[in-house]
């Protein structure tokens, strides 16, 4: 009976001992992050750093409407193609939108010199002042200024560019001309002109009354002399002749001088440019909408404060940096490994092995206790708040450092610059690869550090409890301690807040340790007696059985027994 009581006492003591466990928060989150060492780690909380959505629309940029060129190209707009007349009144914009294949460009066929460079210059312009550099009615009294072409027709009638004048002879003469303009606008002025190349000498004589014409354009930074190239050419837009188009930027205070004795397509209007950060030219078929955004891409507007995006590499406005990543998620919480609910006396005793507690909702790290007054969860607010502050500051710092928002417009190359374009693409691809690698590596490293940081915090909390309890409790694994004394709610609270009174409970703990050790020793002695008794009994049964078998075999002659004296 004594043995049975001791065994029951031991079982009762182990089952109903007061217990406290250290663990961490868990929830039903399915967020996954990658670290340097692991992929798809499920975590309780994380933040997305990569924007992958857009609205599919063209929007105002900070309240300013874009300049939609519609069916016109940049060339058609800036030269004043008659079909682009509606664009003449537009003098300010947030960005410029050109469709992929606009119909109305240079209506009179010819070569547009340095067109890609002009587009690049205009991509940084947010407004201009269109003014008459050489008034039509007063600048050319000795020349005809009404030159038109069927290839530039408007409303079924022959017409010409609105920003240029086609000068021809007057009264059978084409006097030498010399005209200058001094830039007093205190801004760069864009000046455009053209040189006509007739298809035959007859047209040359009829229009300009000379066979040896020239055009000279000179400023402080530009000097060029043009000679018409008279030659038969294939018809383009029903024209065998050509007009080559040229432009220059005139600095404030500089003067440009035009001299010619024929073939000049003279400037009528010029443009005083106002540069603006965040402007640009994009090629897009996206529809315009009544929306406002800070970032515009050819695919649609992005409204995001995230540091990275994978929508499009060409952006206008304050935009996240483009990377080729499919996922950039930074952990802000802990590993999310909910404990097995059916295990342990508490239903979910977690810690360093089992997993986190879904019952603890007010913090990241904390305690679960069990005593005669019940059980419950409590977060350690100080360590949780310190961790939250540290991680929040880190995430904000990462976003701030990587969130260099800017405009990234595409570079323009003409058909003769394919090698340069291919080289540029390789360079851009290299930069994109570097940015993508840096972004991904940064997130991987920070995720690894954050998860290690949480593990360290839980272990520190465990060591804090262990150093208080000393030998007043024993470690039972999974981050739990079993008290050798009764620990009510007040006692539990003192352990949690670091004011546990070790001497107060040491005597009770010592007595209970000795009782438990005594129970173990007596139980061991009983088990030894039982083992000896069982061995002796088994041996006796074996000897009796062997004797009975021998006696039976001797009686029927199967076994002969001889006893010699």
UniProtKB/Swiss-Prot annotation:
Molecular-function GO terms, alphabetical: host cell surface receptor binding
Places the protein is found: Virion membrane; Host apical cell membrane
Cytoplasmic topological domain residue ranges: 550-565
Residues exposed to the Extracellular side: 18-528
SS bond partners: 21-480, 59-291, 72-84, 107-152, 295-319, 487-491
Keyword field: Clathrin- and caveolin-independent endocytosis of virus by host, Clathrin-mediated endocytosis of virus by host, Disulfide bond, Fusion of virus membrane with host endosomal membrane, Fusion of virus membrane with host membrane, Glycoprotein, Hemagglutinin, Host cell membrane, Host membrane, Host-virus interaction, Lipoprotein, Membrane, Palmitate, Signal, Transmembrane, Transmembrane helix, Viral attachment to host cell, Viral envelope protein, Viral penetration into host cytoplasm, Virion, Virus endocytosis by host, Virus entry into host cell
Chain segments annotated as transmembrane: 529-549
Signal peptide: 1-17
Membrane topology designation: Single-pass type I membrane protein
GO biological process: clathrin-dependent endocytosis of virus by host cell; fusion of virus membrane with host endosome membrane; fusion of virus membrane with host plasma membrane; viral budding from plasma membrane; virion attachment to host cell
Positions of S-palmitoyl cysteine lipidation: 554, 561, 564
InterPro entries named among the record's database cross-references: Capsid_hemagglutn (IPR008980), Hemagglutn_HA1_a/b_dom_sf (IPR013828), Hemagglutn_influenz_A (IPR000149), Hemagglutn_influenz_A/B (IPR001364)
Extra remark: Major glycoprotein, comprises over 80% of the envelope proteins present in virus particle. The extent of infection into host organism is determined by HA. Influenza viruses bud from the apical surface of polarized epithelial cells (e.g. bronchial epithelial cells) into lumen of lungs and are therefore usually pneumotropic. The reason is that HA is cleaved by tryptase clara which is restricted to lungs. However, HAs of H5 and H7 pantropic avian viruses subtypes can be cleaved by furin and subtilisin-type enzymes, allowing the virus to grow in other organs than lungs.
Role noted for this protein: Binds to sialic acid-containing receptors on the cell surface, bringing about the attachment of the virus particle to the cell. This attachment induces virion internalization either through clathrin-dependent endocytosis or through clathrin- and caveolin-independent pathway. Plays a major role in the determination of host range restriction and virulence. Class I viral fusion protein. Responsible for penetration of the virus into the cell cytoplasm by mediating the fusion of the membrane of the endocytosed virus particle with the endosomal membrane.
Name this protein carries in UniProt: Hemagglutinin
Organism: Influenza A virus (strain A/New Zealand:South Canterbury/35/2000 H1N1)
